[in-house]
Amino acid sequence: VTKGTSGEWRFWYDLNKGTLLAAALFVVMFVIYVSNHPAGFTPNVVQTASNKAILLAFVAMAQCLVVITAGIDLSAGMVLVLCNCLASWLVVGTPMQTAFGIVAVLVAGLACGTLNGLIIIFGRLQPIVTTIATSGIFFGLALLLRPTPGGSVNEALADVFTSKLFGIFPTSLVVLAATILLVWVPFSRSVYGRAAYAAGSAENAAYMSGMPLKRAKLTAYALAGLLSAMGGLYLTFYSYTGEAAFASGNAYTLYSIAAVVLGGVSLAGGKGSAVGAVFGALAFRTIGDLLFVFDLDPLWQPLFQGIVLMLAIGVGSIGLARVRNRLEWFQ
């Protein structure tokens, strides 16, 4: 291996260290889970775990897009809840009506994210304040749609999206991979994606260099709304119903922040990947599955989630401290 190649690998590793750590953590935890599951490593076990984890994975991807710009979206969970309630009204009937309903749900999520972006960028308000306010609006709309749990969904379509491809591989993971390829990869490699990273790492310098920061941020928030809507749509497919659950919306928001941190995304912005956020979400969700197979009280789940999160943050802090120590050598 040449010196240049070694340097490239080191650079790639430093850039993707958080993603690799989250992936390794998830693999270890999932192996422990399936090894101790009464049914073992079977397609049905993987399917059930995937269908539950994909909800948080979508919201974590949404959160990642915003966090990269040095923002935060505290309305992500409520967008999921709103779109779940909307889907329970619209994703029914004939194939044409169902298709229209899916498009309407995704457009609604896109509109929610765009609203957040417009207020933050042109209203010049802090993301945390803006998204707290809009989360209340989105939850209010969800309550108007579903004051009590109810509704339905096209069950044939729901079964397709929550079943197994060729009887082996979970369809939900195929949809998740397709979303990464169709949403995250084009965005991260586009001018807007590079500007989003620049906004999170050195916004003043990026502004002076003429990068399209406003459009990049608006795109990030809009896509975040779209991804949260996909989570809401999948929740409807999984539960066959809609519910304006305040606690559930808040939980998805908080867990999405934990997932991006676990996935190596810097809350200061400018660093991280949606792939890492997805692995962070999968690892975070697997904690609950581990409690199930070891027959532990679910009340222990927040404690174990907190421990795993603190360990992940600790590893990241050690790496950051090492970088700072090296920089001090040149001062």
What residues fall within each predicted segment?
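Cytosolic-side transmembrane-helix boundaries in multi-pass membrane proteins
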Residues: V1-V31, L181, M208, P212-R215, ...
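Transmembrane helix-bundle core of multi-pass membrane transporters
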Residues: D14, P127-S190, A216-T219, Y238-G249, ...
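Alpha-helical transmembrane segments of multi-pass integral membrane proteins
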Residues: T19, Y33-H37, S163-A198, P212-K214, ...
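Structural signal for alpha-helical transmembrane segments and their membrane-water exit/capping regions
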Residues: L25-F41, T69, A142-P147, W184-V191, ...
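Single transmembrane alpha-helix segments in multi-pass membrane proteins
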Residues: V28-V34, F41-T94, L118-R124, V260, ...
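Inter-helical junctions in multi-pass inner-membrane proteins, predominant
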Residues: N36-T48, L143-L144, T148, F187-G193, ...
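Alpha-helical transmembrane segments within multi-pass membrane transporters and channels
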Residues: P95-G136, F279-G280
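Transmembrane alpha-helical segments in multi-pass inner-membrane proteins
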Residues: S228, E243-L303
